[in-house]
Amino acid sequence: MDVADAQIGQLRVKDDVGIRTQKLFQDFLEEFKENGEIKYTRPAANLESPDRCTLEVSFEDVEKYDQNLATAIIEEYYHVYPFLCQSVSNYVKDRIGLKTNKDCYVAFTEVPTRHKVRDLTTSKIGTLIRISGQVVRTHPVHPELVSGTFMCLDCQTEIRNVEQQFKFTNPTICRNPVCSNRRRFMLDVEKSLFLDFQKIRIQETQAELPRGCIPRAVEIILRSELVETVQAGDRYDFTGTLIVVPDVSVLAMPGTRAESGSRHKPGEGMEGVTGLKALGMRELNYRMAFLACSVQATTARFGGTDLPMSEVTAEDMKKQMTDAEWHKIYEMSKDRNLYQNLITCLFPSIYGNDEVKRGILLQLFGGVAKTTIEKTSLRGDVNVCIVGDPSTAKSQFLKQVSDFSPRAIYTSGKASSAAGLTAAVVRDEESFDFVIEAGALMLADNGICCIDEFDKMDLRDQVAIHEAMEQQTISIARAGVRATLNARTSILAAANPINGRYDRSKSLQQNIQLSAPIMSRFDLFFILVDECNEVVDYAIARKIVDLHSNIEESVERAYSREEVLRYVTFARQFKPIIGQEAGKMLVENYGHLRQRDTGTAGRSTWRITVRQLESMIRLSEAMAKLECSNRVLERHVKEAFRLLNKSIIRVEQPDIHLDDDDDLDVDDGIQDDIDMENNGSAANTETDTLDTSGASTVQKKKFTLSFEDYKNLSTMLVLHMRGEEARCEVEGSDSGMKRSDVVTWYLEQVADQIESEDELISRKNLIEKLIDRLIYHDQVIIPLKTSNLSRIKGPAEEQVDNDPLLVVHPNYVVD
């Protein structure tokens, strides 16, 4: 409603409800006491500062003072809000004695009921409510015209305090009684009131979202001191009211096209039928938004009491818990089998894989984030990657973690882009400015981001999360927007091996399509291999049948899901310090890892660097948090070192049976192996006795090499052959070595180790079978034959192909 000018003497309608509420609220500010003194005297004194204009009032205090006043504020909040602000201005002016008129505002906190974004309906318009959600988009700060001063262009009358209804609003009529101007007004910018204004968008959290539904979103309007107080990815509670605003984006859409050569005069009929605005016509394009008066970070609940998680400590949590909750946490911390009981409660439907469960459990607790003197941030979150064959419960691990953790985001690598994982720069529908929209890593800030099918991601998308995994920030420089955003999240990834099955004869890096920088940023790698084991298969089948037959009774848990979540939230607040003994053990264990990496011919899955030392520190701190300890002890370091070994050591390699590839060879080598004895140390033999027709006995000798001997021998052959190829290329002759030349060269190298003719024959057969495996199985060596189109060859072709030229595959890289 327009406020009348006193000089003109125009009448104003008296608002009895607003005036009565203003008087009651001012009495509340002047009379409400806490601990014997008026509570809001000191906060009101702080409003004397030029950059402060909002007084925060606890709604619980209003309910204690007058229940009728609290009911009136809740039900008629938008109606009485200007009167509440006027009472705050009067109270501040009386208490401080301000000589200038300063507009003050009120912000309510601790509103009892919290609503979800999905529950916002038109019935809540104008009432005081509190909603919670996750910020997914933030807009830049703009000035907003709140109260305008206009000048009539017909009679030059000044019209003050014209309230703006969420869009530019002209006075309905000139205040001068002798002037009936309704359209021709000009805004006086110097005498108008502007406030800072920021628009953000929040959406439902993952925990509140019904399964299979699209998250609902709502726009939040922040004013004055609230601007730039929220960040994309964080979760907040917003207190305010639901309003209806004109949909400017629809109004700004282009209408009919401009026609050239119109018969009308210039400027005539530009607005269609004129005069309808004077009759009260309004556009019907509106949408709902939320006008916030206070913002608080979303908090965890203990005993029904909220605590700000950014400033909370373990002692604060203890004070806010009930006696039963505290006794249960204390009992759990003294449990000798707490480590095992927690993984049983977290993953009751998954059989086995206890090491993976322990690693994920320590990821939930996390390490301690630190900041050096040079302001360099050291991450405390633990990153875990699970690599395994299909049907080894990889996705089940991720699903259960995303359901359990309160701040967890589940996404698939193949269906996610770089912008969807980090952050996107999009154009605003109304102002057409570029704004930042949070991705999965930002939405999982201070939580866990579960990425399934991690190996299916494009290479450019993997590169986009390098910074987020180590520095825990996301830097954006696109479309004129430059920003560094927080991504303090742990990453739990699942990947499938190349070709679907994990090849034990290859290293971890050769089994997955991940770059070395990405692999080094994971603290733990767990390899799950689907093996045929009668005992394990029976136990897994029994577990699955029990789950399908009776889901509730088949799961035995020492603690409930809520108790585990409460314990994890409480234990995460500890910040253990590394003691002198634990630090000494960390240094010694890191030295052992480095020595073993350089001295065991590639027994590790990847190169041991300082990042593995930092991983050991984070795991040790997580173990200390699990026990609610303020110091990292030696047993914590020992368990972290053992768990890290599970991922650093290569999966135990099986022996190489050279005779397994006889069917791929040109010649069947069975008859050549009869009556052959192997007395050398390089290979072991196994004798199979085959009875044919009960009379004759055929013995087949099988050559078996350990994986390490196989790699050393094949590397020696490849390096020699490449050296010969390089020499032949320089001399200009045919490149490559004949098969017989390779065998002869090897026998010359081991001539001093051969003591008998039988051993010479054994060595010769061994190297020939090794060459066959490198040709037909590993495809490291390429035979240059004259005819390889058919396996049935004539005598002439057979004689030519018995001793082909051998060359190393040009794409083969020696480990």
UniProtKB/Swiss-Prot annotation:
Keywords: ATP-binding, Cell cycle, Cell division, DNA replication, DNA-binding, Helicase, Hydrolase, Metal-binding, Mitosis, Nucleotide-binding, Nucleus, Zinc, Zinc-finger
Compartment annotation: Nucleus
Function: Acts as a component of the Mcm2-7 complex (Mcm complex) which is the putative replicative helicase essential for 'once per cell cycle' DNA replication initiation and elongation in eukaryotic cells. Core component of CDC45-MCM-GINS (CMG) helicase, the molecular machine that unwinds template DNA during replication, and around which the replisome is built.
Binding residue positions for ADP: R611, E614
Annotated segments matching region Disordered: 672-693
Disulfide bridge map: none
Compositionally biased intervals (Polar residues): 678-693
The protein's name in its UniProt record: DNA replication licensing factor Mcm6
InterPro entries per record: MCM (IPR031327), MCM6 (IPR008049), Mcm6_C (IPR041024), MCM_CS (IPR018525), MCM_dom (IPR001208), MCM_lid (IPR041562), MCM_N (IPR027925), MCM_OB (IPR033762)
GO BP terms: cell division; DNA replication; DNA replication initiation; double-strand break repair via break-induced replication; mitotic DNA replication
MF annotations from Gene Ontology: ATP binding; ATP hydrolysis activity; single-stranded 3'-5' DNA helicase activity; single-stranded DNA binding; zinc ion binding
Cell division is among the record's keywords: yes
Additional remarks: Early fractionation of eukaryotic MCM proteins yielded a variety of dimeric, trimeric and tetrameric complexes with unclear biological significance. Specifically a MCM467 subcomplex is shown to have in vitro helicase activity which is inhibited by the MCM2 subunit. The MCM2-7 hexamer is the proposed physiological active complex.
Principal subcellular localization: nucleus
Motif Arginine finger, residue numbers: 520-523
Enzyme Commission no: 3.6.4.12
Organism whose genome encodes this protein: Drosophila pseudoobscura pseudoobscura (Fruit fly)
Matching SUPFAM superfamilies: Nucleic acid-binding proteins, P-loop containing nucleoside triphosphate hydrolases
The MCM domain, residue ranges: 338-544
CDD domains (UniProt xref): MCM6
Gene field: Mcm6
